[in-house]
Amino acid sequence: MVTEMSHAESIKRVVDQKLSSHEGFESHMFKIGSYNEAVGESSPFALPYDDSTMALLILSTPDMFDVAFRKWVVQKTMDFGSFDEVCEMVSSPIQSFLEDRLEIMSEKLRKVEENFEILHDYSMTPQRRPKILMQTCGHVAGAAFYYQPCHFQEDGVTWPPAGRMGPNLKFIGLSLHPIYGGHFAFRSVLIFPNVKIPEFCEKEPRPILTASEDVRTALEKFNYNWKDSGFRDFGNPTRRYSTTQMEFFGRPVAERWEVLRPWVDGGAKNID
């Protein structure tokens, strides 16, 4: 059983080489015990690993779409022979792209550490419950501050106001990155059952909103008007999604491929 931090750091180096910051990725190390403590040891979201087990959170930044994903779309068009053929064969482009990149990373990683599990932001149990709470991972790992509504109540005031959410919808929290604000996404968590890092201390997440009133405004924007993406700009992030990326995610799934057609038909001059 491996206990050395040096091995954990070598694992992270491999991940960072294959999912580089230049191509729009970040990795953040944390202990499973820190996550389980945050969600509650008896919670259905707690993970069945030793407290000192190593985990890595993978998130994407604006460059993932505009650099790595763009290259992937162009390469797929070449492989399939036409952009229309790619559209026909690949129904979930971002998910397919990420699966390809994670498989390439995994092949390299197995040379350093054979035993690991990957949980995605879309990984569900048979009961349709998330296998892991990504926003909690992000806060625990110090990647992004997780603003939870229960921590920003105001004495004598009922908040959030009742009746504004749709049926069966819950008023939920929001994670904001210290550089990208809401212009990022949690993607996956890698868990290494045989790698123990008992002495590792996670960094504290840095808040970009400090006034409770600002936090409540951001949470209301996120919960009530998330489709306009205005919540992403709270905290004045220094990097944002491009116009193309915003349009892509703002379209219905069936219409998203058309946003990307200029990448192969019109050349770079038509892309942000």
Swiss-Prot record:
Compartments, as annotated in UniProt: Cytoplasm
Cofactor(s) listed = FAD; FMN
On cofactor binding, the record's note says: Can utilize both FAD and FMN.
Reading the lineage from the top rank, the first entry is Eukaryota
| Keywords assigned by UniProt, alphabetized | Cytoplasm, FAD, Flavoprotein, FMN, NADP, Oxidoreductase
Name its GO BP terms in alphabetical order. Answer: cobalamin metabolic process; demethylation; glutathione metabolic process
Q: Report disulfide bridges, numbered on this chain.
A: none
Annotated residues for binding of substrate? 121, 132-135, 146-148
Q: Which GO terms describe its cellular component?
A: cytoplasm
Main subcellular location: cytoplasm
EC number assigned by the record: 1.16.1.-
Give this protein's Gene Ontology molecular function annotations.
Answer: cobalamin binding; cyanocobalamin reductase (cyanide-eliminating) (NADP+) activity; demethylase activity; FAD binding; glutathione binding; oxidoreductase activity
Q: Name one Pfam family in it.
A: MMACHC
Does the keyword section mention Nuclease?
no
> Which family is this protein grouped under?
Belongs to the MMACHC family.
Function noted in UniProt: Catalyzes the reductive dealkylation of cyanocobalamin to cob(II)alamin, using FAD or FMN as cofactor and NADPH as cosubstrate. Can also catalyze the glutathione-dependent reductive demethylation of methylcobalamin, and, with much lower efficiency, the glutathione-dependent reductive demethylation of adenosylcobalamin. Under anaerobic conditions cob(I)alamin is the first product; it is highly reactive and is converted to aquocob(II)alamin in the presence of oxygen. Binds cyanocobalamin, adenosylcobalamin, methylcobalamin and other, related vitamin B12 derivatives.
- According to UniProt, the name of this protein is MMACHC-like protein
Q: Kindly list the organism's lineage.
A: Eukaryota, Metazoa, Ecdysozoa, Nematoda, Chromadorea
